[in-house]
Every structure is written in C-alpha cells, then in structure tokens.
C-alpha cells in the first residue's frame, strides 16, 4: 500500500515539475486564415507572404512577436540551398517583382537615349581638290551621309553627270576623277536641295 500511495502521490508532483509555470491553461492556438495551420508554421508554407499579410492585418501583436523571433532564421535560410532556403527565396520573390519590371523599363529607355545621341552628328558637306601625279586632280566630297544621302547613289550620279570615274573610298567620302570644284556645289544643291549654302564648304586645294 505504501508503494501505491507513493506512486500515486509522486505522480502529481512529477506532472507539476514538467508543467510550464508561466503558461496559462487552457492554451489558445492561433490558426492562419490562409493556410489553416498554426501561425508558427506559416513560414514553411508555399506562400508565406500571404500568410504574413493576413496575420499582420488581423493580429498585429502576434505578427510582431513572430517577426522578431524568426528574423535571424530567415537570414540564415536565405543563404541555404535546402528546402528552407527555397522558402526564403519564395518570400523574397513578391517585393522585387515590381523593381525588376522598373529596371527593364529603365534599360529600354537607356537604349533609346543612345540612339538619339547618334543623330547629333552635325550636318556638313565639304568639297576639296586634291592634287595627283602629272598635274592631275581629283574632287573629294565628304558629309553627304549626314543628310541621309545614299553614297552609292551619289557616286553613280556624279559619274554620269561629269562623265568620269567616281568611287566611294571611305565611310562618308566620294572621290571623283577630275577637278569639278567650280560646278560641284551647284550640282549637289540641285540634286539634293536640303544641302543649303550654310551646310556646304569649299576647302580649296588640300593634300590627301
């Protein structure tokens, strides 16, 4: 009998020792309205961001406690490669979505600005007479491309107009065989009226 009494009397004592003195009974468990699990497990769900929004809106005090308690864990999980690390990436996907879209718009706008800068080249045509061997000369025409004039078309036009050889020798340069500096300006302005007097210069005789 003594043994039974001791066992029975010892059982409540053991239960009291194992109980949390600060706990209040019965305990109330808060279940998330999104995933239907206890709030402590929201961070392990596929969409923890929605769970946090619901918790912050309906139970801000509980949300604050959970945020403070899990902040260090979230930092360590973000660098992990396991399932928890994947959860950390899931939590970070929603906020940066708008930022990534904004960056794409900025990049597209930046490329547009570069194209505009390419069109700031001054529109200028220069004519020059260059000496060749045996007192011969060639006429050099530069700058037609700044007026969006096709150089191949201009080269054929000059060759036909002056009945001589003409060739495109550089990115924006045409060489005409012969000295036509007295007539070339009038010919150019007649063919391409957009090249006015202020946009064309006669450099005279120059060395190549």
From Swiss-Prot:
Sites bearing Phosphoserine, chain numbering: 9
InterPro entries assigned: DENR/SUI1_TIF (IPR050318), DENR_C (IPR046447), DENR_eukaryotes (IPR005873), DENR_N (IPR048517), SUI1 (IPR001950), SUI1_dom_sf (IPR036877)
Organism: Danio rerio
NCBIfam families, A to Z: DRP1
GO terms for MF: translation initiation factor activity
Gly residues composition-biased segments: 77-89
UniProt keyword annotations, A-Z: Initiation factor, Phosphoprotein, Protein biosynthesis
Region of interest (Disordered), ranges: 1-20, 69-120
SUPFAM superfamilies per record: eIF1-like
GO biological process: formation of translation preinitiation complex; translation reinitiation
Keyword Protein biosynthesis recorded: yes
PANTHER family: DENSITY-REGULATED PROTEIN, DENSITY-REGULATED PROTEIN HOMOLOG
Compositional bias ranges of the Polar residues kind: 1-12
Name of the featured protein: Density-regulated protein
Location of the SUI1 domain: 125-192
Gene: denr
Basic residues: compositionally biased ranges: 105-120
UniProt record similarity statement: Belongs to the DENR family.
Functional summary from the UniProt entry: May be involved in the translation of target mRNAs by scanning and recognition of the initiation codon. Involved in translation initiation; promotes recruitment of aminoacetyled initiator tRNA to P site of 40S ribosomes. Can promote release of deacylated tRNA and mRNA from recycled 40S subunits following ABCE1-mediated dissociation of post-termination ribosomal complexes into subunits.
